[in-house]
From Swiss-Prot:
Origin species: Alteromonas mediterranea (strain DSM 17117 / CIP 110805 / LMG 28347 / Deep ecotype)
PANTHER family: D-AMINOACYL-TRNA DEACYLASE 1, D-TYROSYL-TRNA TYR DEACYLASE
Catalytic activity, reaction form: glycyl-tRNA(Ala) + H2O = tRNA(Ala) + glycine + H(+); a D-aminoacyl-tRNA + H2O = a tRNA + a D-alpha-amino acid + H(+)
Name of the protein in its database record: D-aminoacyl-tRNA deacylase
GO cellular component: cytoplasm
Lineage per the UniProt record: Bacteria, Pseudomonadati, Pseudomonadota, Gammaproteobacteria, Alteromonadales
Length: 145
């Protein structure tokens, strides 16, 4: 499971011209699901994101987590994160989960974050989406669990 995490002052996701998810201060999570991902990866990444200190304290140090700043999370599925880009000029997706498995893991991941008390908005799995964001910093982290 791959998560590309961006600290944002705001973010939204649009499908067919309609905003279906939006947040204020918080994190945008672009989530790529691999074939072998399961409950262990879901819990590991969900726990990591809830505890990860990527928000600034009063001294400007990255010392606060999402809960401590009252932030929100926007989760958007992005299968291109699992692409193999090592050979050739076209990405390969052999590591990626099937659409059925990917959607199930995506939904379980969102549920895991909500079960930890996080305010979570989402995109629409498998849809053609437009994602808007204001990256605060910029601050971006790549997690591979």
């Amino acid at each position: 499971m791959i998560g590309l995490i961006q600290r944002v002052s705001e973010a939204n996701v649009t499908v067919a011209g309609e905003v279906i998810g939006e947040i204020g201060k918080g994190m945008l999570v672009l989530l790529g699901v691999e074939k072998e991902d399961g409950d262990a990866e879901i819990e590991k990444l969900a726990n990591k994101l809830c505890r990860y200190r990527m928000f600034s304290d009063e001294d400007g140090k990255m010392n606060l987590n999402i809960e401590q700043v009252g932030g929100e999370i926007l989760v958007v599925s992005q299968f291109t994160l699992v692409a193999d880009t090592q050979k050739g000029n076209r990405p390969g997706f052999s590591r990626g989960a099937t659409p059925e498995h990917g959607e199930a893991i995506y939904k379980k991941f969102v549920h895991a974050l909500r079960a930890k008390g996080m305010a979570v908005s989402t995109g629409e799995f498998g849809a053609d989406m437009q994602v808007g964001l204001v990256n605060d910093g910029p601050v971006t982290f790549h997690f591979n669990v």
